Amino acid sequence: MTHQMHAYHMVDPSPWPLTGALSALLMTSGLTMWFHYHSVILLLLGLTTNILTMFQWWRDVVREGTFQGHHTPIVQESLRYGMILFITSEVLFFTGFFWAFYHSSLAPTPELGSYWPPVGVYPLNPLEVPLLNTSVLLASGVTITWAHHSLMEGSRKNMLQALLITILLGVYFTLLQMFEYYEASFTISDGIYGSTFFVTTGFHGLHVIIGSTFLLICFIRQLKFHFTSNHHFGFEAAAWYWHFVDVVWLFLYLSIYWWGS
């Protein structure tokens, strides 16, 4: 065994970056096959490979940080910077969608009748399901903060309770969004309004599903006593991500549902 004289974690050789890249190739190729040839076999193979890769890669990270003690304070600081950069990239990702929406809505083209929303499109009422969804996500922001404070104070029971409520609120939000899509009178093919609406809200919904899964993993880990009051970056990263999802929804609600309608 080699002996290191520094606090950094030298990662062991791993096959997961290779299988992750392969799964990305399979998924993108599978999407093309699905769109043009109506075959989902390659897409399902890519999704399966991707899920298996993520599970085993994050399993290794949990082992290294929780059981082997490789996540020293300086490593945790690096992970924090990495998460901040990741969330920053996500902010820019959604900025592109908001830019497309405002570019189209502030100066509607003659093809749209120089009017927004376009003629023939009947927007959703912002005071119905969208307002309920806003309340649900704001409540989940409160409960995830409650969970974080409970963890810092060493109250495991309250932390688990608050985290479970947050996960249930995330699932409830997703179900409401599905109901909203089902009831909408327009589709993604209804011009620029339909495409910007469904792409922006759809990607946000995907982030809610990812965040709910992230929190569910944290819940399972806490059941196994993985987190302490001074060693819980996995949960902290999930909380940051969830707050980011909340803030994006507020901008989305005010821009697309309220002002855009």
UniProtKB/Swiss-Prot annotation:
Localization of this protein: Mitochondrion inner membrane
Reactions performed catalytically: 4 Fe(II)-[cytochrome c] + O2 + 8 H(+)(in) = 4 Fe(III)-[cytochrome c] + 2 H2O + 4 H(+)(out)
Keyword annotations from UniProtKB, A to Z: Membrane, Mitochondrion, Mitochondrion inner membrane, Translocase, Transmembrane, Transmembrane helix
Stretches assigned to the Mitochondrial intermembrane side: 35-40, 106-128, 184-190, 257-261
Example GO BP: respiratory chain complex IV assembly
Complex and partners: Component of the cytochrome c oxidase (complex IV, CIV), a multisubunit enzyme composed of 14 subunits. The complex is composed of a catalytic core of 3 subunits MT-CO1, MT-CO2 and MT-CO3, encoded in the mitochondrial DNA, and 11 supernumerary subunits COX4I, COX5A, COX5B, COX6A, COX6B, COX6C, COX7A, COX7B, COX7C, COX8 and NDUFA4, which are encoded in the nuclear genome.
Protein's recorded name: Cytochrome c oxidase subunit 3
Organism: Elephas maximus
Taxonomy of the source species: Eukaryota, Metazoa, Chordata, Craniata, Vertebrata
Gene name as annotated: MT-CO3
